[in-house]
Each structure stands twice: as C-alpha cells, then as structure tokens.
Amino acid sequence: MNGRVDYLVTEEEINLTRGPSGLGFNIVGGTDQQYVSNDSGIYVSRIKEDGAAAQDGRLQEGDKILSVNGQDLKNLLHQDAVDLFRNAGCAVSLRVQHRLPVQNGPIVHRGEGEPSGVPVAMVLLPVFALTMVAVWAFVRYRKQL
C-alpha cells in the first residue's frame, strides 16, 4: 500500500437563495491563507445548520468553490472572496468541485430495502453445525461410559 488516497473529482452547479443568515456556510482559503498545500482555492469549512446550503443538501464541507455567479475564485485573497460572496445578491450560483474518496475493491450496490451487513443464515449455519458436532460428541462419550 502506498498510503495515497485516490479521489473522484466531480463538478456541479449549485444555485442557492440567500436566507436570513446568508448562504449558510463558511469558507477558508485564498492566496493569503492556503487551506490545502499548494492550492490557493476557496473551500467550504462549515455548513450552518438550517442555512440555505444545508437545506439544499448538495454543498458539503471540504468542497472547493470554483466560481460565484460566473466569477472565477482563482488567485483571490481570503477577504476578497468573502466580499464576493457577501455582494453576490439573493440568487447565487456556485460552481463547486466535489472530491470523493475512491473505494478500493469491488463496489457492491444493494437494492432498496435490502439489508446491509451479514445475513442471519451466514451466522446461524456455523453455530448450528458446531452445536450438532457437540451433541454428537457428547452422545458418543456417554455411550463409552
């Protein structure tokens, strides 16, 4: 194992309507406050409960915000990015990059309503077999006495 984590990177357009508490998330990053080594991008650090982003459900902590209302966030100071969000208006369009860790090994898709975990029969069958062996050994031992 090389210790490296692989990611599946996807982009998504998310439209939010500013609520009473703003857009409902905090950001980190910028050219003066790099959040990720060698990356001056702007990242979501926290989703506020009951905020616009939480109600929408698509924006996640750790997502990289690429643009706000079509304006690129590359090479911005942190405060300039904050100001851009604050002045974006009520209807805000975000271009977001999600990074999902790639699972090693096969991916198993379960059907809806299908239980997860180990089936009961997989547990009970070995227990039943061991019980039968113990009973057989006990009966055989008693016959020898």
UniProtKB/Swiss-Prot annotation:
The record places the following residue ranges in the Mitochondrial intermembrane compartment, namely 139-145
Tell me, in one coarse class, where this protein mainly resides.
Answer: mitochondrion
Tell me which GO cellular component terms the UniProt record holds. Answer: cell surface; mitochondrial outer membrane; perinuclear region of cytoplasm
Q: Where in the cell is it found?
A: Mitochondrion outer membrane; Cytoplasm, Perinuclear region
Indicate the transmembrane segments per the record: 118-138
Alphabetized UniProt keyword annotations: Cytoplasm, Endocytosis, Membrane, Mitochondrion, Mitochondrion outer membrane, Signal-anchor, Transmembrane, Transmembrane helix
The chain positions of domain PDZ read: 13-100
Domain of life per record: Eukaryota
Task: List the Cytoplasmic topological domains.
Answer: 1-117
Molecular function as annotated in GO: type II activin receptor binding
Its GO biological process terms? Answer: cytoplasm organization; endocytosis; intracellular distribution of mitochondria; negative regulation of activin receptor signaling pathway; negative regulation of angiogenesis; negative regulation of endothelial cell migration; negative regulation of endothelial cell proliferation; negative regulation of ERK1 and ERK2 cascade
Q: How does it sit in the membrane?
A: Single-pass type IV membrane protein
PROSITE patterns xref list = PDZ
Share what the entry says about its subunit structure, partners included. Answer: Binds (via the PDZ domain) to isoform 2A of SYNJ2 (via the unique motif in the C-terminus). Interacts (via C-terminus) with RALBP1. Interacts (via PDZ domain) with ACVR2A (via C-terminus) and ACVR2B (via C-terminus). Forms a ternary complex with ACVR2A and RALBP1. Interacts with MAPK12. Interacts with DLL1; enhances DLL1 protein stability, and promotes notch signaling in endothelial cells.
* Protein name per its UniProtKB record: Synaptojanin-2-binding protein
Source organism of the structure? Mus musculus (Mouse)
Q: Highest lineage ranks of the organism?
A: Eukaryota, Metazoa, Chordata, Craniata, Vertebrata
